[in-house]
Amino acid sequence: MAASVFYGRLLAVATLRNHRPRTALGAAAQVLGSSGLFNNHGLQVQQQQQRNLSLHEYMSMELLQEAGVSIPKGCVAKSPDEAYAVAKKLGSKDVVIKAQVLAGGRGKGTFESGLKGGVKIVFSPEEAKAVSSQMIGKKLFTKQTGEKGRICNQVLVCERKYPRREYYFAITMERSFQGPVLIGSSQGGVNIEDVAAETPEAIITEPIDIEEGIKKEQALQLAQKMGFPPNIVESAAENMVKLYSLFLKYDATMIEINPMVEDSDGAVLCMDAKINFDSNSAYRQKKIFDLQDWTQEDERDKDAAQANLNYIGLDGNIGCLVNGAGLAMATMDIIKLHGGTPANFLDVGGGATVHQVTEAFKLITSDKKVLAILVNIFGGIMSCDVIAQGIVTALKDLEIKIPVVVRLQGTRVDDAKALIAGSGLKILACDDLDEAARMVVKLSEIVTLAKQAHVDVKFQLPI
């Protein structure tokens, strides 16, 4: 799925979790990346920092319907009885039941109920009720969810269509074109990553001037190149124009339709929709961001959002608390350079309070894999003494018993050092980032070795 080149630095970090983002943004590197189509224009692919909001399929489909885009008839059901009612109302001889989870690979997933597959075709309202009862309230396990799985709280019940042809269509932002780009392919209904790898020439791109907007001629030209029959090229282009309007209206970073089809009646339909929204637009897209399903997120991500912290949990054992995304990335890099593995990305921003620093420590220490913590602060806008007070408060309140290495530089750093020195806590201070990284890696290794030898080692604070 998906072909947005802008998964950015934060989303690149997310891939370190050993599972891929829900939309296959990794495909972008193949479709639009170093050896992909964009380089045919002599342009260097660049990245921007952003974090995307993903909505459930049924929510995305409702937005499409609102925009006048053609979609199959259907409705969300939050209980087996509702699934029965929707299937009966549709009146089709067969309907499709789709589990609503924010993870890819659902078709090949397995529910904790034992049901195989998150997309099922049923042939009666009674069967719709029976199948949905094995989905709703159950966890679905896919390659992307890992062993934790994702809870399915509702299903999408929709009419079954019999497509003559399937196509792929997407809109994303492409920095090297300085605006949006349409992406199309005659090979829809399959994994776009496979298409990009095996037949990259099957991927067609159409840049859009951000000031002029999409022209009907551009949409018509793309529809023709994608292979839509002449009698429905106009209809396909109309849907593309409506999707582009939706893309702009809601500050989307990606809209992916896979597949867009010509059905047995000759109509153009969008059978599936994945839409990502730029979190930077939350202040003006309240309608969209109120739809976020926190049951699909890590509990720590929810806590981080409530504390206004930028947090992404990873698979390592060294907790990181840093101000600024760039410095956070550099901190993680230098930890890796010295043989360590970061347990998280955590940017407290430039205006963090003592409360936020305490909440940041709560987030870090809620991960039982964390064996040591590195705090790396450069005080520009941020005042180092505020961070220091937060560290002292957190260590006392949370009774943290793992080693904490602190590197502070910048505004009011002397006050911060005095505060830490006078706290009576055993906080390991370093002026040099390289030295701090070496130290925290060594400390994590000591604790790891002790655990492997079944030796109980604790770093008592204070000593």
Swiss-Prot record:
Domain ATP-grasp spans what residues? 61-288
Can you tell which superkingdom this protein's organism belongs to?
Eukaryota
Residues with the Phosphothreonine modification: T341
Cofactor(s), by name:
Mg(2+)
Organelle targeting sequence: 1-53
Q: Where does substrate bind?
A: N323, G380, I381, M382
Has UniProt tagged this entry with the keyword Cell wall biogenesis/degradation?
no
This protein's UniProt keywords? Acetylation, ATP-binding, Ligase, Magnesium, Metal-binding, Mitochondrion, Nucleotide-binding, Phosphoprotein, Transit peptide, Tricarboxylic acid cycle
Q: Which residues carry this modification: N6-acetyllysine?
A: K78, K88, K129, K139, K143, K216, K368
Which PROSITE patterns does the record cross-reference, listed alphabetically? ATP_GRASP (PS50975), SUCCINYL_COA_LIG_3 (PS01217)
Record field: catalytic activity: succinate + ATP + CoA = succinyl-CoA + ADP + phosphate
> Would you tell me the protein name for this molecule?
Succinate--CoA ligase [ADP-forming] subunit beta, mitochondrial
